[in-house]
């Protein structure tokens, strides 16, 4: 039995054909060994991301709000902790100590926690999400209390969206006690449909959600978006923009394909080995992300 931390920040038919394989994509592509990323501390990478967002139809208000947050965060921490342009690193390497970075943020902003992956992604992607229903606020408040602390202090973070949209997308989903990923995928899809959640499908911008299975008891299980970011595919690359955590940096990453993005996220967030919970899985909008796979030998890749 275990409980994960929640700060880590129509595929049903498809999965039916792959049920025996647990929906994983079979590929001989080597496991990701190196990432190319920027902390958006320079004008060139900011201009690149701004154009990608504009080309995808993200509003000027959402883009400006995002970069205002980036500037506030980057100005609060030691520049030596951030990249200069794009840099290469192992997927698990950091240029900073998370605790020192947290102290630097707190020194400048006191008790305001800042913005995390969910607030950042919803702020950027909000125009591509439609909500007509509601979520169970009791479960949401239990797990999203720090998110709500930020939204209470800075409601403009959602760029005019109602809190309801955030709740419906990120409130936990009750599920069954199983390690079967197709079952969990179908459960979250059905619950989102019940809540009236739908996505505007656009090839230039996609919401990428890292779904975690939490088991509090044999009869109390839930699915939670533990991390989320915005994918911006182009003809020659797959870009991914994220806020790593409340007091950790923004990142723009560049991958060759979705499988590399899957590896990056699974190396960071799939810690279900030897547990009673299902492996982490990754959704692209409301479906399983093409290229997602479970990594068999994570210790050799990170």
Q: For each of these PLM feature ranges, what is it?
A:
Residues 1, 11-17:
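N-terminal secretory signal peptides
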Residues 3-7:
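N-terminal export leaders
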Residues 19-22:
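C-terminal motif of bacterial Sec signal peptides marking the signal peptidase cleavage site
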Residues 48-215, 222-226, 233-248:
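Acidic/His-rich structured neighborhood in mature extracellular/periplasmic domains
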Residues 240-243, 247, 256-302:
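Low-complexity, Gly/Ser/Thr/Pro-rich intrinsically disordered linker/tail segments
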Residues 253:
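An anionic, turn-rich surface loop/hairpin at beta-sheet edges
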């Amino acid at each position: 039995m275990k409980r994960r931390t929640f700060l880590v920040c129509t595929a049903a038919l498809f999965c039916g054909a792959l049920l025996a394989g647990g929906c994983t994509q079979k590929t001989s592509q080597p496991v990701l060994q190196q990432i190319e990323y920027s902390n958006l501390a320079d004008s060139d990478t900011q201009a690149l991301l701004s154009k990608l967002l504009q080309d995808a139809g993200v509003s000027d208000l959402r883009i400006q709000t995002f970069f205002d947050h980036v500037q506030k965060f980057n100005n609060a921490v030691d520049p030596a902790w951030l990249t200069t342009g794009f840099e290469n690193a192992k997927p698990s390497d950091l240029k900073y100590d998370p605790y020192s970075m947290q102290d630097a943020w707190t020194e400048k902003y006191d008790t305001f926690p800042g913005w995390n992956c969910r607030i950042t992604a919803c702020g950027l992607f909000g125009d591509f999400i439609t909500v007509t229903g509601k979520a169970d606020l009791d479960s949401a408040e239990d797990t999203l209390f720090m998110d709500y602390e930020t939204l209470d202090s800075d409601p403009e973070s959602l760029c005019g969206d109602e809190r309801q949209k955030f709740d419906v997308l990120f409130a936990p989903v009750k599920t069954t006690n199983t390690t079967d990923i197709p079952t969990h995928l179908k459960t979250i899809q059905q619950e989102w449909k019940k809540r009236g959640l739908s996505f505007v499908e656009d090839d230039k911008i996609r919401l990428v959600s890292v779904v975690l299975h939490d088991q509090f008891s044999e009869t109390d299980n839930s699915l939670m978006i533990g991390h989320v970011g915005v994918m911006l595919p182009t003809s020659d690359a797959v870009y991914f923009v994220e806020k790593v955590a409340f007091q950790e940096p923004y990142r723009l990453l560049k991958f060759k394909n979705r499988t590399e993005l899957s590896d990056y996220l699974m190396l960071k967030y799939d810690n279900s080995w030897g547990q009673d919970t299902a492996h982490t899985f990754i959704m692209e909008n409301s479906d399983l992300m093409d290229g997602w796979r479970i990594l068999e030998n994570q210790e050799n890749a990170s």
